[in-house]
């Protein structure tokens, strides 16, 4: 005996209309087939809705355009018109703060973007701009929906334009938790932060097969565009997560340091600091080694200054010779930029300059004070550096500091040589408060290089060149390799005990809360891109 057919609701009655709505909601919620969901889970990936549930506060998600469907009839697409069209969009809260979100659904058309799909993303981005809340894009897509032709490409262009208009107005965060290929990669590239998952995320303009055909190069997905590649080599991403839950947790923590928009202050948990110097503070008095050639870990300095020693690092695997990230001082977010003597002696190179410049501009856009720790012997020498554009690309860091109007505090811990001294948040670029430790060496260059240039003939003509060089180097060090020449000219505002660093930063930030500074009227600057 066959099962009776499910009775369809009578949509001419109120009860029937309500039942019909429930049926449609059920269809929209389960737009992907059970088999597609199973395959997604088998890869260790979550579904679009599961990701939203993890990201947002429980019960806060409000979906938009749940019943949107594509209108294409090409190649039999009209036979398959799932609700939602392969992307879930809406708004909700993270830790009680409003955010907008879109989550691409790989279980529907492989997450491929079509016209209506793109319109949904554009609509939620416009909504975020209107309401002044961050937008988080969860990317897991096979790329453009080929069957819809140029309509798909047009949708990408509309998204890129919204990314650009929203830049510096609302925080934009991209979670790449699957493939993101072709033109689709440019949306995350424009956003403020990109988070990828190890062994799961892949981003590239052209895939391995096309590269093999065109250039003959053999490369796998992971090597070409995996999370490690984009975190350590290209600098496209800001964090490599172990799994999707880790990635989402990183985004939630990141949001806690960012304001909702450019007209808001970052979230603060005001707490008056105890300015008494502690034994922990005194550890900084011995952190810089006696030998100028011996490294130390700048992370230790950073953690001594921040509340509870908590430092939230960004781009930790990329350009490790410079450290960037967020922390709090008296419960208020600050951005940190610091040379890292443990890597390339803290030299600035192309990647470090661009990493720091982007970070400073992000902080400036979103009203986050920047604290800079300086220990830099100069720019990294090398033919490759010069040929790859260190002049133009290093200038980006100058531009970033010089146009920043947020509070800027700089602490010189040891070396500050040559042009790199100027570049690293110097008084000359507009820093508000410049401090130096007694161990600071602020000069055109180090003793050996200077003596070899200034006293080449004297050394050559002396009976004992080694003794003469050592004596002249000592004279140079005593005369110029200190913070006091700069202090005499007001280039540093104070020479302080290292153990007093947090106290000075706390007081400085208190005073700078009312800082008022504006740039000359202009359409925009012409940063040396």
Q: Predicted segment positions?
A:
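Ligand-binding clefts of soluble mixed alpha/beta catalytic domains
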Residues: 1-529
